């Protein structure tokens, strides 16, 4: 479903833990990281799409999370010209997203990137709150900045973060290796990385 302006309705999902860290997912077979996201189908609400994508991409159900906040407005980004598919009609020029901030209320071992037949991700880790804004692919940076700034008012009682001067603490990143049924910790360069295996 693409709107009259050429944007595809989409949901973005930020999952935080009790430490205020957020789940950062590695795209399948790539060295590219992002938050879980996905399109909204016809006759589907944004919340319904969020829960569907949450299960398909992360393996979590509604009972595993609590909705803390939903972005007030649609946030848009345009796709680079190299990613546009001119052979499809209408042409999708970008995404308009409704963002959800979720609290993980169950054990992180329930996270399963292999719950779908065509997984979007093959690994994940916990990172500091602002880390994704600096690390995401360039054409998504502004949307991430806006979403996280809005979410910060919820998590940090309106405390303002300086995105330009703040530096991520790499030693605080968590890395784990995961299988479909189990999670085990491994230490490597003081990081914890969750790697999904089929």
From Swiss-Prot:
InterPro entries, A to Z: Nudix_hydrolase, NUDIX_hydrolase-like_dom_sf, NUDIX_hydrolase_CS, NUDIX_hydrolase_dom, RppH
Recorded GO MF terms: mRNA 5'-diphosphatase activity
Domain Nudix hydrolase: 6-149
Keywords annotated in UniProt: Hydrolase
Gene Ontology annotations of biological process type: mRNA catabolic process
Pfam families membership: NUDIX (PF00293)
Cofactor: a divalent metal cation
Cellular-component GO terms for this entry: cytoplasm
Enzyme class: hydrolase
Domain of life from the UniProt record: Bacteria
Residues spanned by motif Nudix box: 38-59
EC code(s) of this entry: 3.6.1.-
Protein family: Belongs to the Nudix hydrolase family. RppH subfamily.
Free-text function comment from the UniProt entry: Accelerates the degradation of transcripts by removing pyrophosphate from the 5'-end of triphosphorylated RNA, leading to a more labile monophosphorylated state that can stimulate subsequent ribonuclease cleavage.
Protein name, UniProt field: RNA pyrophosphohydrolase
Protein species of origin: Pasteurella multocida (strain Pm70)
């Amino acid at each position: 479903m693409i709107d009259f302006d050429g944007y595809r309705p989409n949901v973005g999902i930020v999952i935080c833990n009790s430490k205020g860290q957020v789940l950062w997912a590695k795209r399948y077979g790539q060295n590219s990281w992002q938050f879980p996201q996905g399109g909204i189908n016809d006759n589907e609400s944004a919340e319904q799409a969020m829960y569907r994508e949450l299960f398909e991409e992360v393996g979590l159900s509604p009972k595993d999370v609590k909705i803390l906040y939903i972005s007030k407005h649609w946030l848009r980004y345009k796709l680079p010209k190299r990613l546009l598919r001119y052979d499809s009609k209408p042409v999708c020029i970008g995404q308009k997203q409704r963002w959800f901030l979720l609290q993980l209320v169950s054990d992180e071992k329930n996270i399963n990137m292999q719950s779908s037949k065509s997984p979007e991700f093959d690994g994940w880790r916990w990172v500091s709150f602002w880390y994704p804004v600096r690390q995401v692919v360039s054409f998504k940076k502004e949307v991430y900045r806006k979403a996280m700034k809005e979410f910060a008012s919820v998590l940090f009682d309106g405390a303002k973060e300086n995105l330009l001067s703040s530096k991520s603490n790499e030693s605080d990143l968590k890395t784990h290796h995961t299988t479909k049924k189990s999670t085990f910790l491994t230490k490597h360069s003081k990081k914890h990385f969750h790697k999904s295996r089929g």
